[in-house]
C-alpha cells in the first residue's frame, strides 16, 4: 500500500467521500447480504482531476512495488478507464477483456496484440472477495497470458487478498477500508461509532471467492450491519449528511428531542403565527403553504422567522416544485413570496429529473445566497390512489443520493423505510394522526408509533391532529412525546 501518511492519499480519501464514491448505509451486495458501506468508483469518470490523481497514485504504486509486465488489463468495467490512463502513462500496451465474447466479428474474449507467455498486470477498482479479478485471470490464462500481480484502488478487507493468493496472484492496494475509515474519522467526517460498526461488519463478513461465507453462518452475517438508517441516532447520522441544512436539522432534533413537524395549513397569517408560537417549543419543523395565505406580507415572514429563531425550529415551504429548471428557479427566488430568502427547506417532485435540483440552486439568487438551504424530494405520497410506483421511487432515490447536487438534498418525503438507504438523509412522513384512518379526500393517516417504527419516519408530519384540537399546544406536546418515544424504541432495538 502507498505510504498512508501521504497528504495526497488523505486528500484523495476525503475527495472520494465528498463526491459519493463511497457512502454509508444499508446496501445490497452481490453476495446476497447487506453492507454498511458501498463503493461506487464509477463516479470518478465525471471528475477528471480525481481520475488523474487515482491513476498517478496507481502508477506510483506500481513503481514502488517494482511490478513489471508486458501488458495491463482493467477488470471490466469500472477499472477500464483507470487501466487506460495507466497504460498511457507507463507506455505499456493494454489488453481489454470482455465479460462475454461477441457473437459476431472476431468473437474474441481478449482484445489486443499479445503472444502466449506474455505477462499482464491487472488493474481493479474495488475488491471484496476477489472473484472479479479471478474471472479476469482465468480468461487471460486461457489465452496463454501469465498473471502474477494485481493493483487495486480499494481493498474492502473481506478476504480478497487471501482468495487471490490461493491462485498465485498477489494483490497490492492503494487503500484499505480501515485506512479510509480512519482518515474520515480523523478529519471529523464520521463518528467513531461508524468506524466501529463497519469494523464489526468486516470481522463478521469474510467471503470466499465463490461467494460463500467463511464459517458458513449467514445468520451472524445478516445481523452484522449496524449502520442501517433506522438503527442510528440522529447525532450519528448528522456527520454523514452531505447537506449542511440536513446536518443542522439532525442536530436540532437531537438537542431539542423532537421529531415533530407541524403542518400549518391555515389561510390567515395571524392564525399561523399564533399556532407557531404555541407549538414552537415542541416542533423541529414548521411546514407552510404560503400560496393559501390570504393576507401574505413581508411582515408575516419576518414575524415567522422571529418565532423560528425564538423557539428553535426550521421553516419548510411545501411548494412541491415540479417544473423545468428555469421556471423552478424563478418560482423559488422571485415573485411575491421570494421563498429562497426565508424557507430553510422546500419540497419538490422528482418528475423533471435532476434538473429540479439545478433549478433550485439557480433560484437561490441574492435572497438565499450564502444561506443554508435544502430540499426534500417527494418519493411517495400518503394520498390513496396516487400514481407513484416502485420505479419512480427507485429513480427518486438515485436523484437524492447520486450526482453533483446531492449537497442540496436534505431528505426524502416518503411512506416507507426502503425508499432510500443513505443515513445522511432524513425521512419526512406526512399523514400522522393518533386516530388512524382515511379522510373524505383520500388522505391516509397512521399513528406516530407506526410511522416511526414500521415506516421508518425520522420526522412525522402532523396537521389537523394539532390544528383541530381544543388545545393545539397540548396536542403538539402529546405528538412530540409519542413520536420521540417511538424513535427511542426504534434505535434501542
From Swiss-Prot:
Coiled coil: none annotated. The active site is at 320. Keywords: Decarboxylase, Glycosyltransferase, Lyase, Multifunctional enzyme, Pyrimidine biosynthesis, Transferase. Disulfide bonds: none annotated. GO terms for molecular function: orotate phosphoribosyltransferase activity; orotidine-5'-phosphate decarboxylase activity. In the N-terminal section; belongs to the purine/pyrimidine phosphoribosyltransferase family. This is Uridine 5'-monophosphate synthase. It comes from Drosophila melanogaster. The gene is r-l.
